[in-house]
C-alpha cells in the first residue's frame, strides 16, 4: 500500500519510524529495508549538518511511501513493514 508519510530517525535511541500522516500509526522498516530508508534520509542531509553525531536525525523526509506490513496491525503499536520505495520526496529540517 502507498501512504503519505514522514520518515524520521530518532537520534537518541536510534528508532527509525515512518509516520502515516493523518493517523496515529507508525511503521518501522524491517531488516530488508532499514538501510534503504536510511540512505534516503542521508541523501537529504546538508553538508553543514554532516558533522553531527547522527546527521540523519536532523531532517524529516516527507513523501509517498510504498509499505508492505510484515506483521499484523495492532492498534497503538508500531508495525514493522518492508519499505519498497518513496516518491515525491521533500526534506525538511527538524524544528
Question: PLM features: residue spans?
Answer:
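N-terminal secretory signal peptides
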Residues: 1-46
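Beta-strand-rich cores of mature extracytoplasmic or soluble domains
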Residues: 40-95
Amino acid at each position: 500500500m502507498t501512504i503519505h508519510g514522514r520518515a524520521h530517525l530518532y537520534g537518541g535511541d536510534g528508532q527509525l519510524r515512518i509516520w502515516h500522516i493523518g493517523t496515529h500509526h507508525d511503521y518501522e522498516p524491517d531488516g530488508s529495508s532499514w538501510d534503504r530508508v536510511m540512505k534516503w534520509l542521508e541523501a537529504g542531509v546538508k553538508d553543514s549538518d554532516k558533522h553531527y553525531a547522527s546527521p540523519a536525525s536532523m531532517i524529516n523526509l516527507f513523501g509517498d511511501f510504498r509499505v508492505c506490513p510484515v506483521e499484523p496491525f495492532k492498534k497503538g503499536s508500531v508495525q514493522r513493514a518492508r519499505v519498497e520505495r518513496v516518491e515525491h520526496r521533500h526534506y525538511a529540517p527538524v524544528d
